[in-house]
């Protein structure tokens, strides 16, 4: 086959025409909801916020086209930092939510909320990018050290947003329920999301009580995400989990073997095709 046919000019022309048609539309009242996982959603909504060069052009993607854009994010990815976090906290997988949350930061929201100019908004997004993507292996000695080693220039944050970041990072070292998470390799962004959720929960409730109090965790998750989103320059309640019920992905292979865990299935080399994919919920799911 002629490889040049794969990326033929007509295809790029079609995309260019589509973009031109969308640009000509009034999308101010168009409500758009996008479903998916962290990487895919992040890319189309505002660019892959895990990329090192994302901060150079953070205000791009569908969020610039549709003001009333919302994302519903899958929460079964239990690999990496998220998997480590779930060893200590009875929360849904937060990694993809964090990924999409950063990608959803809007210039107009930052400017309106904090009276920033265009350069100030871009610098603010760059700080959030550094903070939410920073990963550590050994336990940080303090919140200040953790923020400093992230490389984030926190002086570029508006005072009000800086107070939000300070509050959440300090909670990681003061809330007895969150302190154990610092002993494992973590992504700071996931910890900040967890701290925002636990901020909504009665300090007297530990892991065992929260496992039995799914309504409490559900409410705290939605409220915590909304409050954090608003502070980050994201419209509240526009980055939502597909469920707040603890769940795991299960892959059934054609040879009858079932693998539980999205992370494990991604590393499995069974030599057989996947016959079925199901989600195993810890209880009747709230969707």
Regions found by a protein language model. Name each.
Residues 1-34, 39, 48-67, 71, ...:
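Non-transmembrane, aqueous-exposed alpha-helical and coiled segments at domain scale
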Residues 40-45, 79-82:
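Short N-terminal binding/cap micro-motifs at the start of the first secondary-structure element
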Residues 46-53, 206, 210:
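Short, flexible/disordered intra-domain loops and linkers
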Residues 61-65, 74-286:
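Electropositive, gly/pro-rich neighborhoods at or near active sites that engage anionic ligands
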């Amino acid at each position: 086959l002629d490889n040049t046919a794969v990326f033929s000019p007509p295809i790029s022309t079609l995309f260019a025409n589509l973009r031109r048609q969308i640009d000509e539309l009034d999308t101010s009242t168009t409500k758009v909801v996008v479903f998916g996982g962290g990487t895919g959603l992040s890319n189309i909504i505002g660019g892959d916020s895990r990329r090192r060069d994302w901060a150079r052009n953070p205000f791009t993607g569908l969020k610039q086209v549709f003001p009333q854009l919302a994302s519903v994010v899958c929460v079964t990815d239990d690999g990496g930092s998220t998997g480590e976090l779930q060893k200590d906290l009875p929360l849904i997988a937060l990694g993809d939510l964090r990924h999409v949350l950063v990608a959803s930061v809007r210039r107009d929201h930052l400017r309106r909320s904090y009276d920033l100019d265009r350069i100030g908004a871009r610098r603010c997004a760059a700080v959030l990018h550094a903070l939410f993507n920073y990963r550590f292996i050994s336990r940080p000695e303090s919140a200040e050290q953790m923020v400093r080693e992230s490389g984030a220039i926190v002086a570029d944050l508006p005072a009000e947003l800086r107070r939000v970041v300070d509050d959440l990072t300090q909670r990681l070292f003061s809330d007895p329920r969150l302190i154990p998470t610092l002993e494992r390799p973590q992504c700071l962004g996931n910890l900040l999301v967890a701290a925002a959720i636990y901020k909504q929960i009665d300090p007297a409730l530990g892991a065992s009580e929260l496992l039995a109090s799914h309504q409490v965790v559900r409410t705290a998750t939605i409220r915590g995400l909304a409050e954090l989103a608003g502070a980050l320059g994201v419209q509240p309640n526009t980055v939502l989990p597909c469920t707040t019920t603890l769940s795991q992905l299960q892959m059934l292979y054609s040879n009858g073997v079932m693998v539980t865990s999205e992370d494990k299935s991604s590393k499995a080399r069974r030599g057989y095709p996947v016959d079925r994919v199901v989600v195993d919920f810890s209880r009747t799911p709230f969707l």
